[in-house]
Amino acid sequence: MRKNRWMMGLAALAVISCGVEEVGRRPEVNREDIWTGPGMNAGNGSREICYITCFDYPEGYDWRTDPQKGSVKCSLTVFADGLPMMKVPVGDEYQVSPDPDMHRMIDGHLYTDYCTGSETVIKKDGKTVLRYPASEVLCGMVVKGDTIYTLGHSRHGDGFAYRRNGEIIIERFSGRTFGRLHYDDGRICFAFTEPIISENETIERYYHCADGDISQAALRDDVKKVWDIISYKGDISYIASLTGVEKPVLFSDGRMCALVMPQNAEPLSFSMMPGEEHLFWEGLFKYQDHTVASALWLSPERCVSFEEGMVANSCFVSGDGIYCAFNPAALGGLIYRAGEEFAMPAGYAVMGAGCGAVVNGIFHLGLSSLEGGCPKLWKDGKLELLEIHGYIASVTAG
């Protein structure tokens, strides 16, 4: 059940002047021209930098319904420690998407992906760095020097491709990945499943890829369904349902543990998150009245469940703590900070899947106005206003 303690540290409202008017005066030299500002020099190398990406729309435009999506004059603005860093024009003519899940900050650079219908275009800081002849939804990107690794699902059917600078390393025309491309033990890893037809029966086989080398995951014969699978500290860990076992089970570090579960709840999904010392995970459940809710696990025996209707957003692990947000439901929104709960400011919500980060030990969460006002940055209970007309799409530590 949802905890009763509410920590209301919402004082010290500060205003960050982002200089949007100055940023907006970018000369229209060519479509890939961008504006750069004082945020390019943020940080001195001794502390982490907080990068915020926002979509900034013309004054008076209803960005919540976005009736002219893809054609309205819009900018993807990046802030570094509260200072405007760059502004990239958004729209079909610029091949920069207004979707919040089609950009990310990596090593202080803005990477965007865009689909033309026949090609995928990737840009770095507003400049095209590669394009390849496939229409893909990217679910992961890793950058090593000048090399860009991507994991993408086909927009026109089943299958996926793992690429290096647009060139195919691994391609499958059926199956799916588990939605993450990440480092583990110094290797770039991901997991996927592929259907195998055997004697008129379709069987799911599960695989792991590390630096392009594929190995089949060794699972028990009584596995009915694998909910999630990940490489952690060089070994394969997974959550599965077994024949004859009521509760889902975690297999990790050579051990099998049944999960403590919310009562009268049917699992819909699990997502594992690696911590410094052990794994954490988040689950989504359906109750008998068809309402849904999230739960968080600190270990197989330690489950934090929430009231029906409370669904986790922007969930991540920093150090060995879980951080996430729950957008407003019947009892209002909730911010979860490594075991502590805070009331989300009324009238605000999280608009993207990656709107939270711990920067220099402080939880930063991007909150956007449900009424169309300016967004705010929540910093361990304090609020900072960003004077833009739009919403926060991501918050990243760098």
Annotate each language-model stretch with its function.
Residues 84-92, 127-132, 167-172, 213-220, ...:
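A short beta-strand motif characteristic of beta-propeller blades
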Residues 37-39, 43-75, 95-101:
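Beta-strand-rich domains and repeat architectures in extracellular enzymes and scaffolds
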Residues 1-7:
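Bacterial N-terminal signal peptides that target proteins for export
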Residues 95-105, 135-145, 175-185, 223-232, ...:
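Repeated scaffold domains used in trafficking and secretory/extracellular systems
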Residues 47-57, 112-116, 150-154, 190-194, ...:
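Recurrent small/Gly-Pro-centered beta-turn motifs in extracellular repeat architectures
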